[in-house]
Amino acid sequence: MRNLVLGVVLGLAIATASSALLAQRGGPSVAEAVTADPAHYSVSFENELVRLLRVRYGAGEKSVMHRHSASCVIFLTDQTFDFTLPDGTTEPASVPAGALGCGDGNVHLPANIGADAAEFIMVEFKNRETFQR
């Protein structure tokens, strides 16, 4: 349970830090994840309220800088990532399988630094009102 809480706290801290940087930069200027990195992000379902993404990074794979709207994540595997933020700083995060996390939109470049593939499901909310319900 301690690892689960720690993983969620780390994930939310990264989301908050990159969300603050996004606000400082005056809004999203980078492409959203599916457009920027279709090799790792695929749309499984979409309607007027949410978009459900299936995400998979092989061991050692990394993305490009991209953005997310407010979202919740369900981690399907144990995973260890480095997240590079728009200002060039890097934040490490280790999250156990089964952890859940939600956060405001963010901009980052994730890299799977773990020895195994990392998989998760992300639910992106299309507007703040839906996310805040």
Residue ranges and their predicted role:
Residues 1-4:
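Positively charged n-region of N-terminal signal peptides that target proteins for export
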Residues 21-31:
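Cleaved targeting-peptide boundary
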Residues 78, 105-128:
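Ligand-binding loop in jelly-roll beta-barrel domains
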